[in-house]
Amino acid sequence: MGGDVAGAATYMHEVYTRSDASVNGRATIPVLWDKKTARIVNNESADILRIFNSGFGTLATGPDLYPEPLRAEIDSLNDAIYATFNNGVYRAGFATTQQAYDEAFADVFATLDALELRLSDGRAYLHGST
């Protein structure tokens, strides 16, 4: 196949199948695609951000998105956001009952409210100036 086969896909499951023909689960996004090996490197958003932050050596010249002094705080907030927001969106989307949908919906918007409150002090980022 060669080239950017991920970009030639119409549906996400095609990207997963091109990466690993034996895959049979749900095709989710985001994914980090390696054009050279034609493989999905990772499909977990927090991991992808860490890879972008430190996985490119001297090619990465931007700010440190995961500074050592803030890692515990970042990880804690990411875990909370993942449980109630990221997972809440999936729970709402795949809900099979109105009650399950309503609970997931409430989690998603409670998380957005909490994040908005955190940012209401004028900070630009969830962890202050970084």
Regions picked out by a protein language model, each given a short descriptive name:
Residues 1-43:
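N-terminal G-site of the GST-like fold
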Residues 24-25, 35-36, 40-130:
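GST-like fold's C-terminal all-alpha helical module
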